[in-house]
């Protein structure tokens, strides 16, 4: 018999069987047979106990049923988990532990499993894609790692048990259950997007905590509400400072949002009932600001859950990639890229490799912007490819999570980009090569600081080879400026210098232009380097600068930056003073045969001539740049032209600015979309240099345009204008009210996009609001708050919740997510949203067949008196044959989409103004606010409802807003 008794001996014996590394527990192999006999007997009696006693949430496990198992793709893994759970006698182990240890592991694990399954089963009833076997296995296994901690690791159990849980799951081939079980820390909520199973487990674990000890010193397990549990944990956290408390409050807010989302679905979270308790959904038009914020949160969480469900399943992820490959519309491709950019950090290694292959293929895409976006994302994905073990590791443990690391992948893709397959045509080779610098920049910006040098080394190896063909040499030269020279030692820099010096002798204009551009950019940092100056002299001696004005200009700039004497001052003087040079540049830049590097240098020369005070035809230069922006085949030339044009804008007179703006606007209207899509990025900035009068005319022209093809690019333009609108007041001081009214006008134009009848325009509106406004840093937090206040309720009304295609769903998910990030950040910083809402409601009923400009002006006038106006559309008219109700409602939607505080009254709540019961219901819909009736004077004079005897809640008891109408008699 063991000296400490059988139970402690069996307890240690079982733990050592589960975790053989527990050498701090004495070996007890001699008890194998006794343990097997005892455990089988114990299992028999515990089974009988379960049959006779009612279910206990701190003792029993309600595992997934056969029906639930049949719906899961993880059926095999879950059955394997149940077998492992049984073979290891884990339940019996926890029951023995309850008898001999002060802590009660069983009560905690069973409690977490109970809450998790209680919630998960209800969510499934609401249509949320929760995998019940997956969450059941993860909840039952989430703390098994506590048995793996050695005696000397007891103090670190809260931090180390995640590793040992993951270890047990990996040993038993439970990868999906293990991934969720081992990542249930509240700090895992700092990841922006998690699967619903992970959220449920973290939520359940958060609520089941120690609630003290009984008189025998045994742990009492408590089931807390979310708020109570937060207070308990905050009191227990070690080394709590303000930063850590804020960090904890941030993750708690994520759980709170998730709980509120579940409550909105009718999920019972207080464990009193398994039946759903649906909460009636109010129409978005009737929500106050707090309810609107909650609605945004719930929609974003719902979309995230559904998208993460698709991305976390191998089969559905493959379907998404296949759909992305097969699309022919570049905007659809952009939507897929946006989803991958937002969610790729949650992909597993295999999914990342599949996505990277797709991105590589996209670098052959005919649209330059798609190639650039794919290259940026490829670099970012390589930088974040390695799975980092985020939890604390035991001493002397080194985890190898994948056979392939990011450095091996980087070498592979470097080779595929620089030396593509021989079957790739020349044009695609060049497109692919031009992407290299984007990949390098993105990789070095997103990787860890200490890893940057390691990523640069494989790239430098290509510069040691001097036998490249011309096109490969040009690609490497074009990429060289993206290598941070500060990372390199002298020998590595000399490799780059020698590479440029060697290829300068090639009689290829674009190679020589690339070399001189590189030297020009490097010159300020290396004026003291003898090797660099030697390279400069060697290159300038070889390059025939006299024959090409662009090269001569760069040679002049290099000598000036390096402090070298100018050899041919007359030639350089000619570059800056001869008007014929400008004419030649205008001609060369519009020729297809001119290398794109030369075009970029020419634009730089034109701008430098203007800045140096040389008399120049500025308007001619500006229109030339606008032409390049509209028609250049090379995307880099378009962007260079646009950037130069915006820099030139302050130097133009007001009439010249207006002329250029009109020219660019025509480009929006008459150009094919594949060309005009580049204009908004720069037109939106440029028009903010127009005089207020001309700017208002520009906005009005875009608003009144009937050209369908302009709709999407107009939205993009308005988005860019909003990004930079904060600078306008300093350029043209005007009354604050005028400035704000114009901002609202621009925001209203974007809202109109949500009401457009074309699906692609609606998607573009969502893209502009989500990606261009809320996701970017152009706007301050206060500006975003004002934007949210203007857009939010209308967005909820106009964005159709029935997403008819997967692509629309992806687009909406990204948009809602960007707004949700802002909401979370703002509430964390400011605690809550505060907006001043009108306290008076104007109820404006009518047939509105048609809805005229007169109706719209009346609604505006009432709104400006301090009302929120609700247009109540009659289902039909007794007096005339009206258009179908849905047609009239659609027209109303489009007509008032851009108007602040003018909404459509919910069609599912008809109000008969002659019925006091309906009018009572109307008052109750706006608690704390005064409801006014809006009517024409002829209606008040003739309508039967005004001839009835007054009674409580009749129309005569409502205050009115009456607009005068002339009768046929002229009164």
Regions found by a protein language model. Name each.
Residues 342-350, 380-388, 438-450, 462, ...:
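Residue-level signature of the C-terminal ends
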Residues 112-116, 129-172, 178-188, 205:
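His-Asp-centered metal-binding catalytic motifs of divalent-metal-dependent phosphohydrolases/nucleases
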Residues 328-329, 366-368, 406, 421-425, ...:
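Short inter-helical turns and helix N-cap capping residues of alpha-solenoid HEAT/ARM repeat scaffolds
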Residues 333, 371-372, 429, 433, ...:
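Residue-level detector of extended alpha-helical repeat arrays and alpha-solenoid scaffolds
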Residues 715, 719, 725, 729-971:
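Nucleotidyltransferase catalytic core that binds NTPs
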């Amino acid at each position: 018999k063991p000296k400490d008794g059988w139970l402690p001996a069996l307890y240690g014996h079982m733990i050592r069987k589960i975790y053989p590394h527990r050498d701090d527990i004495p070996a007890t192999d001699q008890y194998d047979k006794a343990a097997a006999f005892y455990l089988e007997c114990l299992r028999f009696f515990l089974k009988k106990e379960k049959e006779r006693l009612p279910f206990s949430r701190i003792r029993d496990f309600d595992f997934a049923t056969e029906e639930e198992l049949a719906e899961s793709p993880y059926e095999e893994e879950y059955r394997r988990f149940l077998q492992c759970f049984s073979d290891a006698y884990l339940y019996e182990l926890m029951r023995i532990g309850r008898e001999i240890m002060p802590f009660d592991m069983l009560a905690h694990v069973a409690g977490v499993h109970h809450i998790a399954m209680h919630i998960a089963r209800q969510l499934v009833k609401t249509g949320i894609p929760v995998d019940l076997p997956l969450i059941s296995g993860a909840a039952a296994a989430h703390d098994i790692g506590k048995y793996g901690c050695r005696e000397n690791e007891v103090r670190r159990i809260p931090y180390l048990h995640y590793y040992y849980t993951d270890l047990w799951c990996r040993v038993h081939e439970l990868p999906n259950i293990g991934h969720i079980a081992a990542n249930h820390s509240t700090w895992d909520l700092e990841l922006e997007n998690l699967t619903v199973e992970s959220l449920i487990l973290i939520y359940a674990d958060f609520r089941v905590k120690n609630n003290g000890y009984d008189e025998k010193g045994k742990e009492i397990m408590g089931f807390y509400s979310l708020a109570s549990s937060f207070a308990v944990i905050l009191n227990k956290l070690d080394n709590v400072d303000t930063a850590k408390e804020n960090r904890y409050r941030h993750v708690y807010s994520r759980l709170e949002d998730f709980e509120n989302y579940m409550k909105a679905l009718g999920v019972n979270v207080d464990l009193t009932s398994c039946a759903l308790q649906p909460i009636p959904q109010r129409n978005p038009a009737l929500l106050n600001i707090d309810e609107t914020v909650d609605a945004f949160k719930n929609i974003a969480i719902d979309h995230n859950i559904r998208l993460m469900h698709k991305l976390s399943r191998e089969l559905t992820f493959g379907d998404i990639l296949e759909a992305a490959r097969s699309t022919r519309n570049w905007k659809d491709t952009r939507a897929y890229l946006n989803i991958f950019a937002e969610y790729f950090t949650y992909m597993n290694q295999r999914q990342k490799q599949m996505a990277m292959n797709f991105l590589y293929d996209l670098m052959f895409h005919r649209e330059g912007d798609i190639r650039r976006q794919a290259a940026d994302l490829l670099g970012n994905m390589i930088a974040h490819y390695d799975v980092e073990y985020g939890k604390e590791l035991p001493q002397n443990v080194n985890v190898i999570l994948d056979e392939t690391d990011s450095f091996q992948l980087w070498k592979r893709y470097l080779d595929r980009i620089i030396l593509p397959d021989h079957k790739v045509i020349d044009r695609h080779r060049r497109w692919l090569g031009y992407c290299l610098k984007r990949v390098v920049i993105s990789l070095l910006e997103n990787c860890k600081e200490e890893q940057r040098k390691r990523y640069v080394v494989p790239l430098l190896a290509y510069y040691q080879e001097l036998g490249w063909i011309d096109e490969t040499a040009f690609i490497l030269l074009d990429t060289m400026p993206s290598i941070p020279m500060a990372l390199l030692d002298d020998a590595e820099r000399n490799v780059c210098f020698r590479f440029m010096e060697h290829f300068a002798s090639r009689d290829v204009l674009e190679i020589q232009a690339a070399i001189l551009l590189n030297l020009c950019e490097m010159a300020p940092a290396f004026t003291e380097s003898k090797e660099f100056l030697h390279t400069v002299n060697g290159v300038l001696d070889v390059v025939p600068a006299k024959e090409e004005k662009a090269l001569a200009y760069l040679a002049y700039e290099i000598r000036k930056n390096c402090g070298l004497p100018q050899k041919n001052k007359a030639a350089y003087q000619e570059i800056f003073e001869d008007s014929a040079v400008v004419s030649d540049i205008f001609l060369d830049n519009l020729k297809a045969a001119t290398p794109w590097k030369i075009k970029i240098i020419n634009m730089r020369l034109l701008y430098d001539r203007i800045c140096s005070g040389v008399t120049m035809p500025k308007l001619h230069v500006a229109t030339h740049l606008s032409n390049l922006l509209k028609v250049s085949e090379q995307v880099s030339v378009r962007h260079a032209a646009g950037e130069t044009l915006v820099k030139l804008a302050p130097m133009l007179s007001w009439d010249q600015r207006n002329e250029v703006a009109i020219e660019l606007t025509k480009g929006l209207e008459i150009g094919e979309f594949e060309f005009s899509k580049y204009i908004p990025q720069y037109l939106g900035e440029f028009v903010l240099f127009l005089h207020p009068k001309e700017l208002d005319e520009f906005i009005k022209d875009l608003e009144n345009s009937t050209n369908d093809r302009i709709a999407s690019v107009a939205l993009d333009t308005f988005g860019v204008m909003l990004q930079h609108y904060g600078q306008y007041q300093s350029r043209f001081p005007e009354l604050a009210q005028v400035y704000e009214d114009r901002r609202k006008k621009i925001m209203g134009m974007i809202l109109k996009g949500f009401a457009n009848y074309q699906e692609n325009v609606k998607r573009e509106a969502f893209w502009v609001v989500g990606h261009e406004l809320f996701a970017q840093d152009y706007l301050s937090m206060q500006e975003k708050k004002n934007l949210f206040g203007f857009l939010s309720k209308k967005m909820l009304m106009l964005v159709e919740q029935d997403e008819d295609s997967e692509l629309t769903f992806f687009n909406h998910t990204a948009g809602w997510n960007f707004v949700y990030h802002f909401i979370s950040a703002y509430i964390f910083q400011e605690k809550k949203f505060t907006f001043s809402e009108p306290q008076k409601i104007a109820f404006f009923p009518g047939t509105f067949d048609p809805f005229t400009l007169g109706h719209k002006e009346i609604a505006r006038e009432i709104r400006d008196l301090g009302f929120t106006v609700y247009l109540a559309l009659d289902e039909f008219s007794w007096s005339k044959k009206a258009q179908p109700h849905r047609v009239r409602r659609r027209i109303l939607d489009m007509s008032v989409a851009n108007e602040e505080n003018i909404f459509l009254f919910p069609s599912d709540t008809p109000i008969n103004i002659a019925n006091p019961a309906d009018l009572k219901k109307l008052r109750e819909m706006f608690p704390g606010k005064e409801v006014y009736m809006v009517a024409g004077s002829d209606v008040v004079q003739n309508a039967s409802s005004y001839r009835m005897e007054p009674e409580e809640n009749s129309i005569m008891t409502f205050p009115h807003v009456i607009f005068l109408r002339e009768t046929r008699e002229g009164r």
